[in-house]
Regions:
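Short beta-strand segments enriched in small/hydrophobic residues
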Residues: 6-11, 45-61, 161, 169-176
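Short beta->alpha connector loops
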Residues: 89-92, 113-118, 237
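N-terminal helix-turn-helix DNA-binding module of bacterial transcription factors
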Residues: 1-51, 333-334
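Bacterial carbohydrate/catabolite-sensing allosteric modules
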Residues: 33, 71-82, 97, 103, ...
Length: 334
């Protein structure tokens, strides 16, 4: 249409050689008329790069992973990368299939918030043969950069806060006990209680699944059995569920029961009462993960030893925790 060779068109599209203004105008006019889009596949074969990054998360409905993904996407976009987003639904088989698809797409790097048992997962990720950053938990046997919050320290700070408010009968709602994140957060809870020589009441640690509904059911069990004056929930969603369980029983938060979560997702600011929590900006954590991967891609996949970036958590005190008060006698509650 422009009356020029394929080579000349290539030079115009890629700005690889000088082309006269008249020829450039003809080629660009033809491009507009034909709605021509350069082949990313062809470019990637020549450059051996696609400017794409794969992201695999275990649960896209969890606001934590939505905020994490937003931070990753923003940082990648600022550096000229697009993100392929995959949700594994906590299913190791689905996760493995996504990893294969991403590898077929010739991604430049991979960020994984993982699901599954370490041994199998380590081999699956190693087989991806791409620069890799793991978010949230270390995977034994895998040489990869790691970005995570200090889970144990965060749980310790949350529990210590409740103890400093005078609470002793404290319940703990944990995620699935077979996950590394849950184990670290439970360990922080236990350490804080032990430091103050406060016994953990039998049945005070209730297993859940990191969801609002799971937190609701776990808190309901605690209120029916242990009757804690405070609850540490292993993430904010379970903390929100605990708020609901308390309200249904006529328990005032924080007057009758203090509740603190973990993660500091944006949603926790808008509950009533606003949920006290511990954590760090989830979006900033995503940005850090993306930047770590971009640096790894730029320096070559094996240019340096694997890095471990652990973010220090902080207490975010809002309206759902308060000083312990002795329960009022039945019939005398204001």
């Amino acid at each position: 249409m422009a009356g020029v060779s394929f080579t000349t068109v290539s030079h115009v599209v890629n700005n690889s050689r000088p082309v006269s203004a008249d020829v450039r105008a003809k080629v660009e006019g033809a491009i507009r008329e034909l709605n021509y889009v350069p082949s990313a596949v062809a470019r990637s074969l020549k450059a051996r790069a696609t400017a794409t990054i794969g992201l695999v998360v275990p649960n896209s409905t969890n606001p934590y992973f939505a905020e994490l993904a937003r931070g990753i996407e923003d940082q990648c976009a600022a550096n000229g990368y697009c993100v392929f987003f995959c949700n594994s639904d906590d299913d190791p088989v689905k996760q493995r299939n996504y990893l294969r698809v991403l590898q077929e797409k010739r991604i430049d790097g991979l960020i994984v918030a993982s699901a599954g048992e370490d041994t199998v997962l380590a081999q699956t990720l190693a087989d991806a043969h791409a620069p890799l950053v793991v978010v949230d938990r270390n995977i034994e046997g895998l040489a990869a950069d790691l970005v995570q919050i200090d889970h144990e320290r965060g749980a310790y700070l949350a529990t210590r806060h409740l103890l400093e408010l005078g609470h002793a009968k404290i319940g703990c709602i944990t995620g699935p006990t077979d996950t590394a994140v849950s184990a670290m957060r439970v360990h922080g809870f236990i350490r804080a209680m032990a430091e103050r020589s406060v016994d953990i009441v039998p049945g005070a640690i209730a297993e859940s699944d990191f969801s609002c509904l799971g937190g609701y059911h776990a808190a309901s069990r605690l209120f029916e059995s242990v009757r804690p004056s405070a609850i540490f929930a292993g993430n904010d969603l379970m903390g929100v569920g605990a708020l609901r369980a308390a309200a249904e029983r006529g328990l005032r938060v924080p007057d009758d029961c203090s509740i603190i979560g973990f993660d500091d997702i944006e949603f926790s600011r808008y509950t009533y009462p606003a949920l006290s929590t511990v954590g760090q900006s989830v979006r900033a954590l995503g940005e850090m993960a993306a930047q770590t991967l971009i640096e790894r891609i730029g320096g070559g996949a094996s240019a340096a030893p694997s890095r471990r970036r652990v973010v220090s958590p902080r207490l975010v005190l809002r309206e759902s925790t308060a000083i312990y008060r002795e329960p009022a006698p039945a019939g005398n509650r204001a």
